[in-house]
Amino acid sequence: MTKKYAMTATEVMEVIPNRYPIMFIDYVDEISENKIVATKNVTINEEVFNGHFPGNPTFPGVLILESLAQAGSILILKKEEFQGKMAYIGGIDKAKFRQKVTPGDVMKLEFEITKFRGKVGTADAAAYVDGKKVTTCQFTFIVDEAAEQTN
């Protein structure tokens, strides 16, 4: 039986700590050494649409960036040397938003590592809807120890 996705949502949750309502990866389409393509299905049921914006629901740009960062975290934390660690955003540069994302859109999230030295790296990222680029940016990321969980 052929596997439909490179990683399901359940498998994603084994790698990154994000959970509802701040979990933005539905599945991973492709993953290689330095690049990932993941999918976020934007639905009207997202909490954010209660206030952003009534009558004109628009997925916030900052959450598109967070979605891209989560895809990047999966890519980074799947590397053997970083399993069990945390990936953090160190910076976001050259963010551009080309069109709005609305309920019903399917975002394809691409994150490609361009440089990695020690625990710090950079990446180019882009989000697409219907094959059109909606957002681009460059990330600086830092990998560090995971914080202790307290309940």
UniProtKB/Swiss-Prot annotation:
The active site is at 52. InterPro entries: FabA_FabZ (IPR013114), FabZ (IPR010084), HotDog_dom_sf (IPR029069). It catalyses: a (3R)-hydroxyacyl-[ACP] = a (2E)-enoyl-[ACP] + H2O. It holds the Pfam family FabA. It is found in: Cytoplasm. Gene3D superfamilies: Hotdog Thioesterase. CDD domains: FabZ (cd01288). Involved in unsaturated fatty acids biosynthesis. Catalyzes the dehydration of short chain beta-hydroxyacyl-ACPs and long chain saturated and unsaturated beta-hydroxyacyl-ACPs. This is 3-hydroxyacyl-[acyl-carrier-protein] dehydratase FabZ. It comes from Lactococcus lactis subsp. lactis (strain IL1403) (Streptococcus lactis).
